[in-house]
């Protein structure tokens, strides 16, 4: 018969192409696919490729008006997940023309926007993305870079120290500023607004900005060191967010902060551009990440969110600790720490990295470690993460029995002792506790902290683990 032949056909006929050779300009994705019973893995992988690119559930006559071969996503490989029944890694290649330049928002809308509710799948997780260099070059990326930040702050050869002010909600602006001053005076480099401190009735943003600026200038004058406080510019509208960043710049402070997932990628990229143009560092908090990345079989791994943040822009990003109260397995965590900091990262499945990633000189991001860490963790943190990290002790500073400033002193002394010992060639993994004990002999503040936290443990198994073959 004459005319157009409609009807439903299997996705794999069009979108499963195991013979396809990926191009340097393709965006590559690794999905963990759990098909519904009876759905072959090839069909499930092809369905993901189709529904996240050009496909729909039926053949449509307008398919004939374009070159689907040029624009379609392709599932080019399927492999079973070791040790898991009915789970597969599906590799999908997307042509670069499907994505708007310089837009993380558009990239995610395409790749993960719709397909996760697809009925043929029981669950779906985006494990990793390979961002091609041609696409990276359309992004500004982080406002400054690790070396530029060190030059701005005049701090070299050690991790930076921070502290989140607690209680996170309820303090007046003046008392909040006082807590900031005590911590900075004691020896910290930074203090931090909590992620949910925006502009509430008990403390409006402008009052907080003013008292925090006063605190850090007073601490700078007394210590002779450059200090910063992460002023949270996150707001209900982009215009209000930029207004807060402008006020921070007018106060002359070095750094502002944004909650990039709750605030959204469009807002975050706008703020990153403002920060580069106006010499502000940008601290990024990942509030809401566990809603997206916590489940092992569904959602999106944090390494993808970390790559997206590096494209969108931020000078610091929270990235798990390996020790402390927030989950993070060592190899996996170090994998996405490298993705934040380094210029070139090789494929390494033992660390969860599915693709080689070349950042072509896009500035790096300082990973921030926080959550249930204290002075006894300092040797491990210094050894695991090296110099290019921010170590953030909230309760581990403010919970000191003598107060905020002594808590800050204890952390700074512990850090300096660990860095000195490491530079002398001592093994922090073996001698860490001894190094801290030695330092505490001439620092009563550190001795009190050691006594206070000697029994604190967070003994839970990590949720985010590597796949291992069943024995």
Curated annotation (Swiss-Prot):
Its cofactor is Mg(2+). The disulfide bond which can form in the large chain dimeric partners within the hexadecamer appears to be associated with oxidative stress and protein turnover. InterPro entries: RuBisCO (IPR033966), RuBisCo_large_chain_AS (IPR020878), RuBisCO_lsu_C (IPR000685), RuBisCO_lsu_C_sf (IPR036376), RuBisCO_lsu_fd_N (IPR017443), RuBisCO_lsu_N_sf (IPR036422), RuBisCO_lsuI (IPR020888). Gene3D superfamilies: Ribulose bisphosphate carboxylase, large subunit, C-terminal domain, RuBisCO large subunit, N-terminal domain. The keyword Translocase does not apply. Substrate binds at residues 114, 164, 168, 286, 318, 370. GO terms for molecular function: magnesium ion binding; monooxygenase activity; ribulose-bisphosphate carboxylase activity. It is an enzyme of class 4 (lyase). Mg(2+) binds at residues 192, 194-195. The modification N6,N6,N6-trimethyllysine is found at residue 5. It catalyses: 2 (2R)-3-phosphoglycerate + 2 H(+) = D-ribulose 1,5-bisphosphate + CO2 + H2O; D-ribulose 1,5-bisphosphate + O2 = 2-phosphoglycolate + (2R)-3-phosphoglycerate + 2 H(+). Binds 1 Mg(2+) ion per subunit. Keywords: Calvin cycle, Carbon dioxide fixation, Chloroplast, Disulfide bond, Lyase, Magnesium, Metal-binding, Methylation, Monooxygenase, Oxidoreductase, Photorespiration, Photosynthesis, Plastid. The modification N6-carboxylysine is found at residue 192. It is found in: Plastid, Chloroplast. The record marks 325 as: Transition state stabilizer. GO terms for cellular component: chloroplast. The active site is at residues 166, 285. Belongs to the RuBisCO large chain family. Type I subfamily. The basic functional RuBisCO is composed of a large chain homodimer in a 'head-to-tail' conformation. In form I RuBisCO this homodimer is arranged in a barrel-like tetramer with the small subunits forming a tetrameric 'cap' on each end of the 'barrel'. RuBisCO catalyzes two reactions: the carboxylation of D-ribulose 1,5-bisphosphate, the primary event in carbon dioxide fixation, as well as the oxidative fragmentation of the pentose substrate in the photorespiration process. Both reactions occur simultaneously and in competition at the same active site. NCBIfam families: PRK04208.1. This is Ribulose bisphosphate carboxylase large chain. It comes from Chiococca alba. The gene is rbcL.
């Amino acid at each position: 018969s004459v005319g157009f032949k409609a009807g439903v056909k299997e996705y794999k006929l069009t979108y499963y192409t195991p013979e396809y050779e990926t191009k340097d300009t393709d965006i590559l994705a690794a999905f963990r696919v759990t098909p519904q019973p009876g759905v072959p893995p090839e069909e499930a992988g092809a369905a993901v490729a189709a529904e996240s690119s050009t496909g729909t559930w039926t053949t449509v006559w307008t398919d004939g008006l374009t070159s689907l071969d040029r624009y379609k996503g392709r599932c080019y490989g399927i492999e079973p997940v070791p040790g898991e029944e009915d789970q597969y890694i599906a590799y999908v290649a997307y042509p670069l023309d499907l994505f708007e330049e310089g837009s993380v928002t558009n990239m995610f809308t395409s790749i993960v926007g719709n397909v996760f509710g697809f009925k043929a799948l029981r669950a779906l997780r985006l494990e990793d993305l390979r961002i091609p260099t041609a696409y990276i070059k359309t992004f500004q990326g982080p406002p400054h870079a690790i070396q530029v930040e060190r030059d701005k702050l005049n701090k070299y050869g050690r991790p930076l120290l921070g502290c989140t002010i607690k209680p996170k909600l309820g303090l007046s602006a003046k008392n909040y500023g006082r807590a900031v001053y005590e911590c900075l005076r004691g020896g910290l480099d930074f203090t931090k607004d909590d992620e949910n401190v925006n502009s509430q009735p008990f403390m409006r943003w402008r009052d907080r900005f003013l008292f925090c600026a006063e605190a850090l200038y007073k601490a700078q004058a007394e210590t002779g060191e450059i200090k910063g406080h992460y002023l949270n510019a996150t707001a209900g509208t982009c215009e209000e967010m930029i207004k807060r960043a402008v006020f921070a710049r007018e106060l002359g402070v070095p750094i502002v902060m944004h909650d990039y997932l709750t605030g959204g990628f469009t807002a975050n990229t706008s703020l990153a551009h403002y920060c580069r143009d106006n010499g502000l560092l940008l601290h990024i908090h990942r509030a809401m990440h566990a809603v997206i990345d916590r489940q092992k079989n569904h959602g999106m791994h944090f390494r993808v969110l970390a790559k997206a943040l590096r494209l969108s822009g931020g000078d610091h990003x929270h990235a798990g600790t390996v020790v402390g109260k927030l989950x993070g397995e060592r190899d996996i965590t170090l994998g996405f720490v490298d993705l934040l900091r380094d210029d070139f990262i090789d494929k390494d499945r033992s660390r969860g990295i599915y693709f080689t990633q070349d950042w072509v000189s896009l500035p790096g991001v300082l990973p921030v470690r926080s959550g249930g860490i204290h002075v006894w963790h300092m040797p491990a943190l210094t050894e695991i993460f090296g110099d290019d990290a921010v170590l953030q002790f909230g309760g581990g500073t403010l919970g000191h029995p003598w107060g905020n400033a002594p808590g800050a002193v204890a952390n700074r002394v512990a850090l300096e002792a660990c860095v000195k010992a490491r530079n002398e060639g001592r093994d922090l993994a073996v001698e860490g506790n001894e190094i801290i004990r030695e330092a505490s002999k001439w620092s009563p503040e550190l001795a009190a902290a050691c006594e206070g936290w000697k029994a604190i443990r967070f003994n839970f198994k990590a949720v985010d683990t590597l796949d291992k073959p069943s024995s």
